[in-house]
Amino acid sequence: MTLFKDHKGVDKLFQGVQTRINARIRGLTEDQILGTAPALIAGEAVTAEMLLAPTLDPSNYTLERTTGQIHYRVRVMGDSSLMNYVPTKGDKLTPKGDKPTPPEGMALAEINSPNGWVEVSFRVAAGTSADDIEKEYRAWVSQTEEWLSWLRSDLADLQDKQISRITRELTRRQDAIRREQALFDQLEARRSAQGEQ
């Protein structure tokens, strides 16, 4: 899978997160809702369901060689499958080297997400030195880390919005439960008073 190519998937991904959070909140009992601050419940629910933003570990890599190419396999922490999605800020941009058939010296990066690695390959032309490849690798790391920072920003925004939304929803539910309980208590008091007459 080529990095940062899915322009629509991130919205679906975020909808999936929201669906899981909503299911978690719907499963709360009245006692849980009344017994805990809404912001605390919201924070715990969102944290439990949010995706872990990917980060590169550019110093943790292996090298391989095939005819005409040098391959770096770089360790990724977090959910590396998120690297498929275009961050909001990058919607109109294409990362350097992220082309199906790169020219000489350019990188072609692919995700090997089940194992938490990204593979980036550099074409080797006549006269290419180790310094040339390392320079391209550092440039690729820099650009990829910039895109990942945008993706992390998208995830942080989503998390903040979800916490705010759920806190408001739980506050409304707490108020509704308390109103219903007060109404019930009034009716129960009237019933008891009628029984004493």
Identify what each model region corresponds to.
Residues 114-197:
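Mixed-charge (acidic/basic) macromolecular-recognition segments
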Residues 63-150:
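Intrinsically disordered, low-complexity regulatory segments enriched in Ser/Thr/Pro
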Residues 6, 11, 31, 49, ...:
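Acidic-enriched, low-complexity/disordered segments with a strong bias for Aspartate over Glutamate
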Residues 1-64:
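N-terminal "first-domain core" detector
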Residues 54-75, 174, 178-188:
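Short, Lys/Arg-enriched charge-dense amphipathic segments
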